[in-house]
Amino acid sequence: GPHDGTSLFSQACDNLTGAGKIFVVSAGNNGTNNVHVKKSFTATDTLLKTVVNFSTSFPQKKTWLDIWGDPSQIFKIKLSLYNVITLISETRFFTLNSTSIDTFIVGNANDTCYFKMSLIPSDYNLKPHVLIDVYSKTNRNLCLTVKANAGTVHAWTGYVSNSTGIYGSFSTTGVVGATAGNTD
């Protein structure tokens, strides 16, 4: 969910515990990883770029990108592959339209990065939401670009395999104008 108490799970916990009680959840043991990135957009500052780093403790390059915006605000996303600082390949910008997309981009060595995207606004909090399932078979840097004219977007990276949390990070590695992640 959007990590702000408005997800269906958060609402269920509120309803189950009642006044004067708390519900405690462990959110993972990734406090030193920059798993979150945030951007507040304006009419003159419309792009967030960040490099997606995969966990080195997992044999495959897999992650989920969980992206949330402000209610009634629209944003678009694009994914790109970079060879250090050179753009190799990219998708078009995708807009929220209540659909799922299964696509890929090919690097310059015929290696492939696969994406499954769900671009569906949440019925529970009216926030735009994109969930991307990434499986990369390339050694190129993966860059997430978010485009908007207003509002704030938050993104988190993480993956679960056999009940174990796998955490990479967001960074600026090699991409001009990229934003590093944080531990929020």
Where are these regions (language model features)?
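Loop-rich non-cytosolic ectodomains and luminal regions
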Residues: 1-184
